């Protein structure tokens, strides 16, 4: 990449139409019906799964958004893109597409899924909801799954449709309290992680799921065309605001999902990485009958080369910026700052599986300096997922700084050891 582009960020900005010439781009992208809630905060967007995802809002700093997610409650309108797969052969198609056994997904449950090309490279991932006996939604991350369904459905009695459903996430320790307040049914306390249900909110039937992209307690709401999204969205925001809710953008999710080891499609995995390489091998069922990519995955190297990384007093540059003994050994695929751990956090994809957690490396950071960093397991904390399941209800009131025990410079000692 040319050096003049290295520190340039490209974004999509909302533009008010003026004059008699319409802005065609504004209508070539599907807009979340609650985008108007973001407009007062000078939003910037990126293109994501044929939709927009909010990258920046002016109402709170990235650190403030992070702490709202970890201590209180946030609302985020996502770019997730659900497609509907229905018909007598819907299950057969999905069994071809995904490497997990879809027959195990019962109505009322969700399942994390990803699809692979024939060579084992990952297309994208997302959340599969079994809506009915022969009807599924797959709320996908960035990537083209619609064409993949079409290309692999020959000879099957199946419909692949765009249901025009939009997804918002409500995340944080107070999220289930808000849901209990908003819906008529008293199901929130009975729900398990990855359950979904149709509930009544302000007289409307809506689908909500016990899922999210923060690994904090939370839920998602799926706005269907028949829903009054504006009324429901304003209700959620107004009632949530009484609990401290704010609307957030990507920064609120990035830190928590990196700490939790939740991978981002197109960044932490691509069509050039197979599931085993990035630590997703547990979601591949090689005992299952044939699925796309099975042969390649059977023959693939099963070792993991993707790890977390904590950086001393810096934010790692994305790209080929990790060195060990003055030799490049891998890439930073995601990075940000963790206000809770008081260090840079990231996801690293290494060139070899022989290097792993506990290794101290050098990383080029956004301040153009080299910082010490340590590879670690993912998730970085809460390995049993007790926070997202509502088992661990402890809400941190302050930062709990990470200390690189293997790096003992005077500067690190003074700042991190006190």
Predicted regions: what they are:
Residues 88-124, 175-204:
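Internal amphipathic helical hairpin motif
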């Amino acid at each position: 990449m040319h050096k003049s582009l290295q520190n340039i960020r490209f974004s999509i900005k909302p533009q008010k139409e003026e004059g008699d010439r319409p802005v065609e781009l504004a209508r070539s992208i599907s807009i979340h019906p609650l985008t108007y809630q973001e407009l007062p905060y000078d939003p910037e967007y990126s293109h994501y799964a044929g939709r927009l995802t909010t990258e920046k809002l002016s109402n709170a700093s990235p650190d403030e958004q992070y702490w709202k997610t970890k201590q209180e409650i946030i609302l985020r309108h996502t770019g997730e893109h659900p497609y509907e797969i229905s018909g007598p052969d819907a299950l057969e198609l999905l069994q071809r597409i995904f490497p997990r056994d879809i027959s195990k997904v019962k109505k009322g449950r969700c399942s994390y899924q990803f699809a692979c090309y024939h060579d084992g490279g990952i297309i994208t991932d997302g959340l599969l909801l079994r809506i009915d006996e022969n009807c599924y939604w797959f709320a996908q991350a960035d990537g083209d799954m619609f064409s993949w369904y079409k290309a692999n459905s020959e000879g099957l009695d199946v419909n692949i449709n765009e249901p025009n459903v939009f997804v918002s996430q409500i995340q944080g320790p107070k999220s289930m309290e808000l849901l209990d307040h908003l819906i008529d049914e008293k199901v929130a306390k009975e729900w398990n992680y990855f359950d979904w249900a149709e509930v009544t909110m302000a007289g409307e039937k809506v689908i909500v799921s016990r899922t999210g992209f923060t690994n904090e307690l939370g839920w998602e709401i799926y706005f269907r065309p028949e829903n009054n999204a504006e009324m429901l969205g304003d209700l959620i925001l107004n009632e949530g605001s009484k609990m401290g809710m704010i609307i957030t953008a990507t920064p609120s999710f990035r830190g928590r999902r990196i700490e939790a080891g939740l991978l981002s499609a197109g960044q932490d995995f691509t069509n050039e990485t197979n599931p085993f390489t990035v630590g997703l091998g547990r979601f591949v069922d090689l005992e299952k009958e044939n699925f796309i990519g099975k042969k390649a995955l059977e023959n693939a190297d099963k070792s993991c080369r993707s790890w977390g990384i904590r950086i001393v007093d810096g934010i790692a540059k994305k790209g080929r910026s990790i060195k060990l003994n003055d030799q490049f050994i891998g890439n930073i695929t995601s990075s940000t700052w963790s206000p809770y751990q008081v260090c840079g956090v990231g996801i690293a994809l290494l060139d070899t599986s022989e290097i792993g957690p506990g290794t101290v490396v050098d990383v080029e950071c956004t301040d153009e300096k080299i910082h010490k960093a340590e590879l670690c397991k993912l998730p970085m904390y809460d390995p049993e997922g007790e926070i997202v399941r509502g088992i661990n209800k402890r809400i941190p009131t302050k930062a709990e700084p990470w200390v690189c025990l293997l790096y003992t410079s005077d500067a690190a000692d003074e700042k991190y050891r006190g």
